[in-house]
């Protein structure tokens, strides 16, 4: 049972079972200020966002249901994200369903909730197999069109989905995507599960396939940025150890020779690594350049599909440990068939064209519920059946 706060509804009860059929109460967003990164947006941007959120809330009230709960609404802002080169703000309308509980014969409202309904404008999608910078993203950032908010090179904007059905569901908006159970600890018998629906303006797709040509060109861009970063780091380490050697050279005591030799050998290792990075850069670049030059345009325009080994491996997306040891991150051999691999996706440029930062480009509707808890699952079933998808789509089509 969730812990209760001090606010009580002026009714009495005997047990929690008495409360499940009490009509749900809805509290609009005015009970709490909009949370999150409101300061990241201008007054004009906030006005547009709040207008959209208020419209969503007005519509939601018409079909609100939450027997046995107090549904409290709130508005929230996130920092936002880049969709290709376009920055869009992310903001949301959330209703948390606070369970009514019986405590000392009085009906009270729990101060925590495990079930919520959420509509997010311009959500960022986490597909689970995203290409990433392996902790060196700072080497691969590029200026963005949002002040103090950098973007990344093309390679790290691409998306790969562990569930091959997800891109179609995201683009179609016809069915939900349900997450795997999310356990909070080893004793959690009622894990969180989330259902997500995605919506775009009529006739628009959110995701499109990356072509082989685009993917190969993005690898070349990565190589050109990776090389100077690696060489700079080796030069830094070599310079540090050379400075240390100079200190030992001033010492006349033979006891220092062992330490001197240690740093001397380490410099040689760094110099060897430096040359290896130079060679790896040339090997990787030559391979990709050859594929771009030797294949017909029709081949290059096919979707980029990467092997399971490349995707599931932990060697900076290289196909094998041996390959990784020889030439490093994002060593590339060839594409594979759709049956044997994973398609690479990107944000649809036709959807993410220049527009105001808080303009609604697409929307995600989420239902988070507690598996195995009857009250939570009733809320899940009600909103799954009664969501006003027509209204949600109208927000996008009015732009």
Describe the predicted segments one by one.
Residues 11-34, 390-395:
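Short N-terminal segments immediately surrounding and downstream of signal-peptide cleavage
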Residues 24-39, 359-373:
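Acidic/histidine-rich, surface-exposed loop or edge segments in extracytoplasmic proteins
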Residues 36-354:
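Short, solvent-exposed recognition patches
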Residues 1-12:
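Bacterial Sec-dependent N-terminal signal peptides
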Residues 11, 365-399:
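Surface-exposed amphipathic alpha-helical segments
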Residues 9, 355, 362-363:
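Compositionally biased, low-hydrophobicity segments enriched in charged and small polar residues
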């Amino acid at each position: 049972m969730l812990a209760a706060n001090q606010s009580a509804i002026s009714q009495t009860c005997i047990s929690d079972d008495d409360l499940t059929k009490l009509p749900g109460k809805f509290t609009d967003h005015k009970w709490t200020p909009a949370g999150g990164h409101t300061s990241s947006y201008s007054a004009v941007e906030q006005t547009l966002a709040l207008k959209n959120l208020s419209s969503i809330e007005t519509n939601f009230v018409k079909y609100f249901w939450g027997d046995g709960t107090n549904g409290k609404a709130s508005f929230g802002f996130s920092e936002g994200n880049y969709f290709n080169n376009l920055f869009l703000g992310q903001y949301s309308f959330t209703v948390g369903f606070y369970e009514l509980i019986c405590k000392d014969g009085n009906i009270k409202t729990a101060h925590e909730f495990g079930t919520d309904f959420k509509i997010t404008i311009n959500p960022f999608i986490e597909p689970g197999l995203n290409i990433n910078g392996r902790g060196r993203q700072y080497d691969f950032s590029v200026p963005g069109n949002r002040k103090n908010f950098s973007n990344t090179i093309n390679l790290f904007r691409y998306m790969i989905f562990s569930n091959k059905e997800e891109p179609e569901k995201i683009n179609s908006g016809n069915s939900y995507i349900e997450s795997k159970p999310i356990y909070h600890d080893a004793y959690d018998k009622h894990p969180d599960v989330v259902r997500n629906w995605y919506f775009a303006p009529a006739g628009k797709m959110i995701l499109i396939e990356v072509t082989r040509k685009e993917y190969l060109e993005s690898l070349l861009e990565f190589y050109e940025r990776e090389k100077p970063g690696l060489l700079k780091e080796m030069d830094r380490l070599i310079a540090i150890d050379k400075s240390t050697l100079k200190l030992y050279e001033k010492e006349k005591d033979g006891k220092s020779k062992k330490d001197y030799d240690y740093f001397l050998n380490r410099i040689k290792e760094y110099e060897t690594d430096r040359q290896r990075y130079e060679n790896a850069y040339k090997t990787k670049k030559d391979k990709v350049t050859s594929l771009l030059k030797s294949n017909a345009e029709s081949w290059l325009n096919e979707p980029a599909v990467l092997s399971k080994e490349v995707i599931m491996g932990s060697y900076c997306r290289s196909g094998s440990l041996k390959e990784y040891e020889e030439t490093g991150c994002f060593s590339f051999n060839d594409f594979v068939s759709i049956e044997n691999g994973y398609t690479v996706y990107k944000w649809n440029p036709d959807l993410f064209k220049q527009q105001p930062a808080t303009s609604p480009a697409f929307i995600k509707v989420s239902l988070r519920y507690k598996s195995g808890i009857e009250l939570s699952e009733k809320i899940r079933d009600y909103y799954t059946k009664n969501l006003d998808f027509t209204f949600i789509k109208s927000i996008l089509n009015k732009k």
